[in-house]
């Protein structure tokens, strides 16, 4: 399958299957992503959500087809980079690792609500919330059309979580981005997402959150009763 540049679809996944050592980690997975969509990928630990993102990036082998719109620029915000935090690197040094991102680091930091002087700080001295915003700024440095987020608030406290999700909402509006967001945070799904993919090694549901996040589907997804506890996002 090919995707034309003027199509509304920027990503088409068909019959995706990933196996590790003969065990199916993902199977029977087909979905598409439209331009401007925010797709939340929801599921329990071990559901294959991170494997899906890595498959989309071509990092892990897979069967089936993954088709991106030609020329689409993609940014990726991983769940954790602990080894980076243990290295004696400044924020500016970290940006220097990325080809094409050696420009004005303070401006990039300002984009994600961080003070420009933070460029000289060591990565290891940042709070979890600050580091997560640095990763987002790093992903934005290549001026992407689409961003992939793997648990963008993992290890971040409640206040930092609110800040990160408010930032994602603002960036989406200001930059006309398409986003794929892996999260465990049910409370933000209705506020942030236009579509949700419920995944537990196989697709459980896919569609608008208000339509598909029923008690029955959530029980199928998690194997227990799940209730929403809403955060307040500005």
Describe the residue ranges of each PLM region.
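Catalytic Walker B motif of ABC-type/P-loop ATPase nucleotide-binding domains
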Residues: 147-151
């Amino acid at each position: 399958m090919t995707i034309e540049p003027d199509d509304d679809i920027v990503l088409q996944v068909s019959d995706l299957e990933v196996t590790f050592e003969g065990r199916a980690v993902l199977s029977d997975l087909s979905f598409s992503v439209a331009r401007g969509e925010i797709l939340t990928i929801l599921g329990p630990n071990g559901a294959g959500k991170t494997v899906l993102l890595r498959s989309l990036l071509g990092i892990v082998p897979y069967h089936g087809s993954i088709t991106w719109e030609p020329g689409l620029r993609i940014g990726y915000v991983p769940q954790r980079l602990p080894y980076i935090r243990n290295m004696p690197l400044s924020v500016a040094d970290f940006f220097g690792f990325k080809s094409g991102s050696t420009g004005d680091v303070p401006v990039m930091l300002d984009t994600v609500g961080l003070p420009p002087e933070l460029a000289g700080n060591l990565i290891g001295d940042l709070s979890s919330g600050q580091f997560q915003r640095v990763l987002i700024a790093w992903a934005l440095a290549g001026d992407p059309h689409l961003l992939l987020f793997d648990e963008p608030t993992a290890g971040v406290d409640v206040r930092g979580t609110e800040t990160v999700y408010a930032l994602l909402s603002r960036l989406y509006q200001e930059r006309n981005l398409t986003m794929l967001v892996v999260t465990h945070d049910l409370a933000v799904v209705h506020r942030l997402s236009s579509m949700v993919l419920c995944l537990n090694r196989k697709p459980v549901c896919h569609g608008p959150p208000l339509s598909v996040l029923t008690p029955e589907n959530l029980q199928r997804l998690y194997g227990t009763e799940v209730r929403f506890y809403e955060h307040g996002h500005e």
